[in-house]
């Protein structure tokens, strides 16, 4: 059994929906910490959950008011993705391979997250884009053809002898003239600009004013297609 298969089976047995093996050797050391590869772990949000959030007037604020965030599916799957990354980094290290988890706790503790700019040198969505899984939408989140933005991601950087997937070129933006996320944003932080490699995050979104209302995620037409395919309407 190859190491790729071993790791994928191990992660999927613990709840991962997909695993991608990505070459990051062409990126700067400042981004990669000198590691050659990244392992991307993905979890998908359920269609029923997304439909419930989409139909709610202000789901996130209500969950906070009722002190129910700890049982929210998105919150739980974000935690699970982080836990899987921490587990994988330990698993690889025990096998003698250098590995670094990019879980939220890890990047905070190691100073790889800049609190002032609310950024990290190598976001999960950047790795996902390099894997050919999707593009960066006008809401500054990954959009995938299959799930829209209804995903939770975490990554592990490593020098383990894995085989990385060959991607001809990252997907270009499929947002076109769509402005749904900008129109529905209650904080008016989405600027409506299509992302490309020369675009700064701040040119797309005012992250400092975003309250994470989640509306741009559930109302993205690509997320809606995923919901409709799986909810029978």
Please give the residue ranges for each predicted region.
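Catalytic cores of enzyme domains
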Residues: 29, 70-187, 191-233
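Non-catalytic, usually N-terminal nucleic-acid engagement modules in DNA/RNA processing proteins
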Residues: 1-74
